[in-house]
Amino acid sequence: MNQLEQKLEQDFGIVFSQKDLLETAFTHTSYANEHRLLNISHNERLEFLGDAALQLVISVYLYNRYPNKPEGEMSKMRSTIVREESLAGFTKACGFEQYIRLGKGEEKSGGRERATILGDLWEAFLGALYLDQGLPAVEKFLNQVMIPQVEKGNFDRVIDYKTALQERLQVNGKVDITYTVIDESGPAHAKEFTMQVAVDGKELSTGFGKSKKLAEQAAAKSALEQLGN
């Protein structure tokens, strides 16, 4: 964690006084499960707290920034900003993914690149930052990293990857596109779904998500990337 601490101080001016919070934020359940005898804490509870802090900061920002936008539009913007893929992108942009502690199995299966894990890490980090330094520190950090992207208009439009994939594949005629859940993991309150998208019965790609809808979108996005779109 020393390298992570140095990075946080150098890049963002953040110095944690409670080092254990930072370590917990970067510990995935798979790592904790593989080291049960050490009684290591994982980041799910911090993720819960960080999600609330993130929602509040973004909500206040949108309320103040767009005084004429109706509630419905602001809700859509917020949903786009805090969606799993967006948070995963910010995690990678900050270089946080290299510091997360994963179990061996999760590491081998590509967990370090999985949007669900990276999005959860982002929220857990915010939760740890909130407990260590309060909401102003969370707001300051988000103003450094997330808000500039909102100001650039990068979240004005929600991309429907399923529709985009359908339009891409049906250019030359109708095809049968199906989405199938091929795996479910995690406790009941924190399920992760693995979705397979197939075209005319042939597997095209897979995706992961905390809900079936999110997993479908992830699978469709992955398929578009494979098709070079």
Curated annotation (Swiss-Prot):
Catalytic activity: Endonucleolytic cleavage to 5'-phosphomonoester
Cofactors that this protein relies on: Mg(2+)
Keyword annotations of the record: Cytoplasm, Endonuclease, Hydrolase, Magnesium, Metal-binding, mRNA processing, Nuclease, RNA-binding, rRNA processing, rRNA-binding, tRNA processing
Residues annotated as catalytic: D51, E123
EC number, UniProt record: 3.1.26.3
GO terms of biological process kind: mRNA processing; regulation of gene expression; rRNA processing; tRNA processing
Residues annotated for Mg(2+) binding in this entry: E47, D120, E123
Ranges for domain RNase III: 5-134
GO molecular-function term, one example from the UniProt record: metal ion binding
InterPro entries (alphabetical): dsRBD_dom, RNase_III, RNase_III_dom, RNase_III_sf
Its job: Digests double-stranded RNA. Involved in the processing of primary rRNA transcript to yield the immediate precursors to the large and small rRNAs (23S and 16S). Also processes some mRNAs, and tRNAs when they are encoded in the rRNA operon.
Subunit structure: Homodimer.
Record-stated family: Belongs to the ribonuclease III family.
Protein's name in the database: Ribonuclease 3
Gene giving rise to this polypeptide: rnc
